Structure formats: C-alpha cells, structure tokens
C-alpha cells in the first residue's frame, strides 16, 4: 500500500479500457445482452472508467437523504437517476468490512474477478468484520477496472485499512443499485452507492492531511 498526495490516474485507466476492448462506457457487450433498460443502464454505470471532474463532499446524513427510488423506475424516476448518477461525490468514514464479490461477469471477467465491496460507517468500529449495525453502512465498490495493476487498491490493502480503523475518504460516481433495494435495513442503509470508486484517501494524524492511496 502506497500513499501519495496528488494526481489521479485518468490516462492510465483510459488506456486500460482500450486494452480490454471495452466500449465507450467500458461495458463488455456480453454483459448487456438480453436485459432490461434498467439493467443495461446499471451495467453501463458500473463499468465507468472516467474520473469525475470534481467530488462533492457528502455527510452520512446527506447521503441517506438522497431520493428514494423504487425498484422499477417511472419516467420521472429515470430522470432523477440519470441526473444523480452524473455526480461525483466523496464520503468520509471508517471501513466496516471488505468483501470480494463473485460478480466478474458484470465486467466481462471470470466470476472471482469482481467488485471489492468496501462498506463505510460513520463511526470507528471496535473491529473489522461483519458484526455490528450493518444496516447503517454505505456501500462503496472498487470495480475490477480500478483494482491492481491500475491502482494498489487490492483486497489486502483495503482490509488493512479496515483492521487499523483508519479514517478514509472514498470518492467516485453515485450509482443507484435497484437490485439491492430489498437489502436496505439488512446489510446496507441505502440503495445508493459510490460505484465505481475512483479515489481513496487516508487521513494522516501526523501530517494532518489526506493522503491518496495509490
């Protein structure tokens, strides 16, 4: 794990998308075939490789106040989702758990090469793991496009932050995952996520500054 104070890796990530043979939204055609408009849009958003021009800081309260959208979108709800998913946002907190998802097919990869779920809570946790109030956590996801070798955001590096209960600031694109609305109140507080994550910073008490996790 390496920390730096600066520069995003837009050019590197864009080059990776080209090398993988991904489309403009970074989506493998196989992941879009024979699905609903909602599913196709969700897959396109998950596969984004562009970096937001800026990040709007949100508190946990502000994140939880994002519009409540049902599982099936009406025309007006489509407008809301499309507007919200163009926002780059940042959220500060503590990593409660890190989970390797077996959803690689979403990204045109083998199942075991899927997302890294990084679940944030507002307060420091007694320990890293799945205990405690899981219904109060915000889901953020590091997609395969932003995992090593593009970045150093490996499962081990993120788990280390969780075990140390380091304060982090995770930023990226807003995404509404309608497929997990029924999980609200179980292991998540909202269907809104930061997904994909495009920036991870760690607070340094010694330097009194945020340092980017490379």
Cite the ranges covered by each PLM segment:
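N-terminal secretory signal peptides that target proteins for export/translocation
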Residues: 1-7
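OB-fold and OB-like single-stranded nucleic-acid-recognition modules
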Residues: 29-214
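Generic hydrophobic-segment detector
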Residues: 7, 11-13, 83, 162
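Bacterial N-terminal signal peptides
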Residues: 11-24
């Amino acid at each position: 794990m390496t920390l730096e104070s600066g520069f995003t890796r837009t050019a590197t990530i864009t080059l990776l998308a080209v090398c993988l043979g991904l489309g403009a939204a970074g989506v493998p055609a196989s992941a879009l075939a024979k699905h609903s408009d909602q599913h196709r849009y969700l897959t396109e958003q998950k596969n984004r490789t562009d970096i937001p021009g800026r990040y709007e800081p949100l508190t946990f309260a502000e994140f939880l106040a994002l519009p409540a959208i049902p599982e099936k979108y009406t025309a007006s709800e489509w407008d809301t989702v499309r507007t919200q998913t163009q926002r780059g946002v940042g959220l500060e907190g503590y990593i409660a758990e890190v989970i390797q998802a077996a959803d690689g097919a979403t990204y045109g990869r083998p199942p075991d090469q899927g997302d890294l779920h990084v679940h944030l809570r507002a307060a420091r946790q007694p320990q890293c793991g799945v205990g405690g109030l899981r219904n109060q956590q915000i889901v953020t996801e590091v997609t395969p496009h932003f995992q090593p070798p593009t970045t150093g955001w490996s499962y081990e590096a993120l788990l280390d932050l969780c075990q140390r209960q380091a304060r982090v600031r995770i930023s990226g694109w807003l995404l509404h995952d309608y497929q997990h609305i029924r999980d609200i109140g179980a292991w998540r507080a909202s269907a809104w996520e930061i997904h994909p994550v495009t920036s991870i910073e760690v607070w340094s008490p010694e330097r009194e500054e945020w340092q980017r996790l490379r």
